[in-house]
């Protein structure tokens, strides 16, 4: 027997065909969210306060200090926040100390700082009752970047950009004449020597001595002449810079100093962030530039005076290892003194080393570095500017490297914590202004911290971020895999990122550094391709936001691949050679072959085993979680694998899910980490189980009670339902799955079912990827899912009195009210159809003055009931089902309702959706299709033993698509079902051809795994043997019930008076320009006329036509379409006097409908201004919904 048994969780054993030992398990798959937020609460939040405080007043007599903060217990639990449409958040209290420097008086006070959103255990936030999450953002890292440019004449030159986290950019560039320029914050350029002079190096000789002679430097100095002898060179340079930054303003050297300090050297205005300083020091450090160069001076140990490395030595990795500690300790450091009128007249520490130029072995080049400033230094320093210029000049000599901006060493992840930290910082900086003003304007005696602080800017900033940021998204909750995938997603779009329209192919493309960090497969199709990506399965994010991938260290001395795992960032990995995960190893963990396939800076090379530094930990570290759930992924074309991974995320949870016979071994951990399953918080013994709760007695004796979620509506309108998995008396460990979530079975992800599939054509019904299905799948509810829709009705106070929820509704018979309770709300369990009442509601109508006759009648018969109109909530088209839950919120019960709302009723309707013709289905290999025919079981082809086939797929869907994985899954699935075993075939390390055929043979199937099929209608065998097997098929969220739609009497657009479009607006089908051409070509004049008039926007004509049909008269001639009148009005608004003439050249009156002219609806009732208002509201709502849909599509 091939393969070995592996236990996944407590409830499933699979036969695994993996051959590679994995030395490390998968990390917790949502830690990218949870760790970031935890870090924010532990450190990030306090750091922002420490950055912003203390705040002084303008006179410097008072100071407000930050002492600390405390988070109190949340007002609502997660479930309560969901039910009440509230936020899951905790009040935060910050302690401030106000110091009066004149009197020495201290006032300490705790200030309420608003409610701060809390993250749930699943990595999400509850915002207004719905579950949202913050998608991480992939952005350019702050740092120092160099690039190569080629102009149109083919001349190469180098450029440089310093990108801060916050603040002005600093750029260096060369023009066609070979002169170097500097640009400050994208303004006009200046010679770069001007910047050096401003830093205090006034004379040409000082600059040449500092940087060494190069062609670029001497040419630039020649161009940079002393224009105004009255100023020193430093002052003239300062004025030149001021003139560029503030053109037209009077310039002085002092104002320029102040401006330059504010632009680059002031921590309030300029910030590198720790990551920027780390990248900067790393780029400019001498140790990272010396490899492969020849030294032009000896390296001497400063303590002993011993010469460690002689002149003319080539710096190899071993030499570098020897001198690296000395360079870190300041070898080659020297101090230069700028002139007294410099921007910052303080000594500058630099580090230097002399080497020979690679382009001219006689030339000595001095490399300068910034002396490695401390990581606390978050601003640019003069040493940084000088060493940047030195590096830039060195590039022309062939020293140093240009940067690739798409390299993952230069792009970093901003996770939840950092994004929130930035929002708090924005809020605090707005607040700081207010505090300063209040400090200055208030009387000193009675001022308190509470009186100074207005928290609104901070709370508004956070609210805005959660409500409307591009990165705050409505969680994709189709199934647990889509939840998990959404939490691990990161986007290059959003504030501070790139825009979809400007994104080049290079940004979107797969880069070699994505290996083990970002999935090359899972990305959306369409305009966002390559801009939205997923984290690879083993990847982690380090403290600076760079993605790390794990590797096994190779002990090169002994030639052993150790089990020690190191996480490397992309730029660290560039220094090493990494062997592939499938390199054969001996029993004592040595490479079995003399040579191994390895990667080095993007090249796949065969190297001697002794030169490999690391080895991959697992073959599936390359790809993301969704792609790792596709068996035989290695046999699929990547485009189809992309579709397969994306479509698994659209699977609908079924009533009775089954895990796949052929899995990849990822199903268990995906289910556990998704947050949809119920996990044991502590080890213990199960004491009680029912459908609603599980009680576990801990080993310490305490009792844990777990509530099970039943049939809750998910964000996507699917049913979120948990089923107990633990049994009475069972021992459970911490983090064991004790209840399956939606789309789970026995603790494993179960997105679909395992039907019997045949690749064959049948009467042409599976043309173009269509799917033919057996009636059995409907009868046995194999692909039945539950959709839950939520409807709400609220009563408000109107000008004419309050609205009311009641059974007493005008003009409604008893039959329609039979399912409403005494208060007018539908009962739970009622079966409702389209148009049925859910909540009876009446709104007061404006009354006219009664006539004398009416007054007399009222006097005789008492006060008549007030005039009300029916505004009840009814079931919309296609919304019928069973009332599953009703929730009533009122002020009396202490529920928080929006202002003006007195009562809110929510009704949940559940629909059992069996699979229909028109529903979309898919396998896991991108093989998608629409159900085209549902055939009775007796007509389906059957196996020799009489078993009917469940699904027929078109064999033409395989060859051109090159997703052969589906065929391998089919054969192995049949063998697995016959043997009654579940199989795991991990990605890139799964069952080989031999394994498949051995298993097929073990199951007693035919050698070619095909079979004879018999036609169910005739009993005759089909001509050829047919591939039949078990394939995992999923039903997708694109269900025909949500899309089928037909208009009867519906709303019209207010301006053009044409029918609205779209299902949400109960709109019509657009008869567009091309369709009109078709009718014109056909000569169908009457059809064309009524389509352009009665059926569209001839307001009077359509009303008259309706009346004529009702009365059985001839339909009158159509009038003028409303849109024509709109066109005429638009032309008149341009000042063109346009008149419309009839055949006799009489001017037609395009008068507007008068108020008193009766407009009637097709049902002959009068059109009132309220109706027009309501219609206007419907149109506005429709447009808003359409915009929301478009935005949602864009997000996808």
UniProtKB/Swiss-Prot annotation:
UniProt-listed Gene3D superfamilies: 2.40.50.100, 2.40.50.150, 3.90.1100.10, DNA-directed RNA polymerase, subunit 2, domain 6 (2.40.270.10), RNA polymerase alpha subunit dimerisation domain (3.90.1800.10), RNA polymerase Rpb2, domain 2 (3.90.1110.10)
EC number assigned by the record: 2.7.7.6
Keywords per UniProt: DNA-directed RNA polymerase, Nucleotidyltransferase, Transcription, Transferase
Catalytic reaction equation(s): RNA(n) + a ribonucleoside 5'-triphosphate = RNA(n+1) + diphosphate
Major enzyme class: transferase
PROSITE patterns according to UniProt: RNA_POL_BETA (PS01166)
GO molecular function list: DNA binding; DNA-directed RNA polymerase activity; ribonucleoside binding
One of the GO biological process terms: DNA-templated transcription
GO cellular component, one term: DNA-directed RNA polymerase complex
InterPro entries reported for this sequence: DNA-dir_RNA_pol_bsu_external_1, DNA-dir_RNA_pol_su2, DNA-dir_RNAP_su2_dom, DNA-dir_RNAP_su2_hyb_sf, RNA_pol_bsu_bac, RNA_pol_bsu_CS, RNA_pol_bsu_protrusion, RNA_pol_Rpb2_2
Function text: DNA-dependent RNA polymerase catalyzes the transcription of DNA into RNA using the four ribonucleoside triphosphates as substrates.
Subunit structure: The RNAP catalytic core consists of 2 alpha, 1 beta, 1 beta' and 1 omega subunit. When a sigma factor is associated with the core the holoenzyme is formed, which can initiate transcription.
Family that this chain belongs to: Belongs to the RNA polymerase beta chain family.
NCBIfam families with a match to the protein in the record: PRK00405.1 (NF001616), rpoB (TIGR02013)
PANTHER family in UniProt: DNA-DIRECTED RNA POLYMERASE I SUBUNIT 2
Protein name: DNA-directed RNA polymerase subunit beta
Biological source species: Lactococcus lactis subsp. cremoris (strain MG1363)
């Amino acid at each position: 027997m091939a393969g070995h048994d592996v236990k996944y969780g407590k409830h499933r054993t699979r036969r695994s065909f993996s051959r590679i030992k994995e030395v490390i398990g998968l990390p917790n798959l949502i830690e990218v969210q949870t760790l970031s937020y935890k870090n924010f609460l532990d450190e990030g939040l306090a750091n922002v306060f420490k950055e912003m405080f203390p705040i002084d007043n303008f006179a410097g007599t008072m100071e407000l200090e930050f002492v600390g903060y405390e988070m109190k217990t949340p007002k609502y639990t997660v479930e309560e926040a969901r039910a009440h449409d509230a936020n899951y958040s905790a009040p935060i209290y910050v302690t401030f100390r106000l110091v009066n420097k004149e009197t020495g008086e201290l006032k300490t006070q705790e200030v309420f700082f608003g409610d701060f959103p809390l993250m749930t255990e699943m990595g999400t936030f509850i915002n207004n009752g719905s579950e949202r999450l913050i998608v991480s953002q992939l952005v350019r890292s702050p740092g120092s970047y160099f690039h190569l440019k080629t102009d149109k004449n083919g001349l190469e030159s180098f450029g440089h950009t310093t990108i801060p986290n916050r603040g002005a950019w600093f750029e260096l560039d060369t023009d066609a004449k070979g002169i170097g320029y500097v640009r400050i914050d994208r303004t006009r350029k200046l010679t770069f020597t001007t910047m050096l002079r401003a830093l205090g190096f006034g004379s040409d000789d000082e600059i040449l001595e500092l940087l060494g002679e190069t062609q670029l430097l001497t040419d630039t100095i020649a161009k940079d002449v002393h224009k105004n002898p009255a100023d020193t060179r430093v002052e003239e340079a300062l004025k030149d810079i001021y003139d560029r930054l503030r053109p037209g303003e009077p310039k002085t050297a002092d104002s320029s100093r102040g401006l330059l300090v504010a632009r680059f050297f002031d921590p309030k205005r300029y910030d590198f962030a720790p990551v920027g300083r780390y990248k900067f020091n790393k780029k400019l450090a001498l140790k990272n530039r010396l490899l492969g160069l020849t030294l032009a001076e000896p390296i001497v140990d400063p303590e002993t005076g011993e010469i460690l490395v002689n002149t003319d030595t080539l710096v190899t990795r071993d030499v570098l290892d020897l001198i690296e500690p000395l360079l870190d300790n300041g070898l080659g450091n020297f101090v230069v003194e700028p002139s007294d009128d410099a921007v910052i007249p303080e000594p500058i520490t630099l580090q230097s080393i002399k080497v020979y130029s690679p382009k001219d072995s006689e030339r000595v080049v001095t490399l300068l570095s910034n002396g490695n400033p401390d990581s606390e230094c978050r601003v640019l320093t003069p040493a940084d500017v000088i060493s940047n210029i030195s590096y830039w000049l060195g590039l022309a000599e062939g020293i140093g490297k240009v940067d690739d901006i798409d390299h993952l060493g230069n792009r970093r992840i901003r996770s939840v914590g950092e994004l929130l930290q930035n929002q708090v910082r924005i809020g605090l900086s707005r607040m700081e202004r207010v505090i300063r003003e209040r400090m200055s304007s208030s009387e000193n005696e009675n001022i308190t911290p509470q009186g100074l602080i207005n928290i609104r800017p901070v709370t508004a900033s956070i609210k805005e971020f959660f409500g409307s940021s591009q990165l705050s998204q409505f969680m994709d909750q189709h199934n647990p895999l889509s939840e998990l995938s959404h939490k691990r997603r990161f986007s290059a779009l959003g504030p501070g990122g790139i825009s979809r329209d400007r994104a080049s192919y290079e940004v979107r493309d797969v880069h070699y550094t994505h290996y083990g960090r970002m999935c090359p497969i899972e990305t959306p199709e369409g305009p966002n391709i390559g801009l939205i990506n997923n984290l690879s399965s083993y990847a982690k994010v380090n403290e600076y936001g760079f993605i790390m991938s794990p590797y096994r260290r190779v002990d090169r001395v002994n030639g052993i691949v150790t089990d020690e795992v190191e996480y490397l960032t992309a730029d660290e990995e560039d220094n090493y050679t990494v062997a592939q995960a499938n390199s054969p190893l001996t029993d004592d963990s040595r490479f079995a072959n003399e040579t191994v396939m390895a990667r080095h800076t993007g090249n796949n090379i065969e190297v001697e085993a002794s030169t490999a530094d690391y080895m991959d930990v697992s073959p599936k570290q390359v790809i993301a979680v969704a792609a790792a759930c596709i068996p035989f992924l290695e046999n699929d074309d990547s485009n189809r694998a992309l579709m397969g991974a994306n479509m698994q995320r659209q699977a609908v949870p079924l009533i009775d899910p089954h895990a796949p016979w052929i899995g990849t071994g990822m199903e268990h951990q995906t289910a556990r980490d998704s947050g949809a399953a119920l996990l044991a918080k502590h080890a213990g013994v199960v004491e009680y189980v029912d459908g609603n709760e599980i009680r576990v007695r801990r080993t310490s004796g305490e009792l844990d009670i777990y509530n099970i979620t039943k049939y809750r509506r998910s964000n996507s309108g699917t049913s979120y339902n948990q089923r107990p998995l633990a049994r009475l008396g069972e021992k459970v460990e911490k983090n064991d799955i004790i209840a399956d979530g939606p789309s789970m079975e026995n603790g494993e992800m179960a997105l679909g079912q395992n039907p019997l599939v045949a690749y064959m054509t049948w009467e042409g019904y599976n043309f173009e990827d269509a799917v033919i299905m057996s009636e059995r799948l409907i009868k046995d509810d194999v692909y039945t899912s539950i959709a839950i829709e939520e409807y709400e009705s609220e009563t408000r106070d109107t000008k004419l009195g309050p609205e009311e929820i009641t059974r007493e509704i005008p003009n409604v018979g008893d039959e329609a009210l039979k399912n409403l309770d005494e208060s007018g709300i539908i009962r739970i369990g009622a079966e409702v159809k389209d148009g049925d009442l859910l909540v009876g509601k009446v709104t007061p109508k404006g009354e006219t003055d009664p006539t004398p006759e009416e007054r007399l009648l009222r006097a005789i018969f008492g006060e008549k009931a007030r005039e009300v109109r029916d505004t009840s909530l009814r079931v919309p088209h296609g919304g019928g089902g069973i009332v599953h839950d009703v929730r009533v919120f009122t002020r009396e019960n202490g529920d928080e309702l929006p202002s003006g709302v007195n009562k809110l009723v929510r009704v949940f309707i559940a629909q059992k959706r069996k699979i229909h013709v028109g529903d979309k289905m898919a396998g896991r290999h991108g093989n998608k299709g629409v159900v085209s025919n549902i055939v009775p079981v007796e007509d389906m082809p059957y196996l020799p033993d009489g078993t009917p086939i469940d699904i027929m797929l078109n064999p033409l869907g395989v060859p051109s698509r090159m997703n052969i994985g589906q065929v391998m899954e089919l054969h192995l699935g049949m063998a697995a079902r016959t043997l009654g075993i579940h199989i795991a075939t991990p990605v890139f390390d799964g069952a080989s051809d031999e394994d498949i055929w051995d298993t097929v043979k073990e199951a007693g199937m035919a050698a070619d795994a095909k079979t004879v099929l018999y036609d169910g209608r005739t009993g005759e065998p089909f001509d050829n043997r047919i591939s039949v097997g078990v394939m995992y098929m999923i039903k997708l969220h694109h269900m025909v019930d949500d899309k089928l739609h037909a208009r009867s009497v519906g709303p019209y657009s207010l301006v053009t008076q044409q029918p609205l479009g779209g299902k949400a607006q109960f709109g019509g089908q657009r008869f567009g320009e091309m369709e009109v051409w078709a009718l014109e070509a056909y000569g169908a004049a009457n059809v064309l006329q009524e389509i352009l008039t009665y059926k569209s926007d001839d307001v009077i004509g359509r009303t008259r036509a309706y009346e004529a049909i009702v009365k059985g008269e001839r339909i009158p001639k159509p009038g003028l379409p409303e849109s024509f009148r709109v066109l005429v009005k638009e032309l008149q608004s341009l000042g063109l006097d346009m008149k419309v003439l009839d055949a006799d050249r009489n001017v037609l009156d395009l008068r507007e409908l008068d108020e008193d002219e009766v407009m009637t609806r097709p049902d002959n009732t009068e059109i009132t201004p309220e109706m027009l208002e309501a219609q206007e509201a419907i149109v506005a709502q429709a447009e808003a919904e359409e915009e929301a849909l478009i935005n949602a599509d864009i997000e996808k």
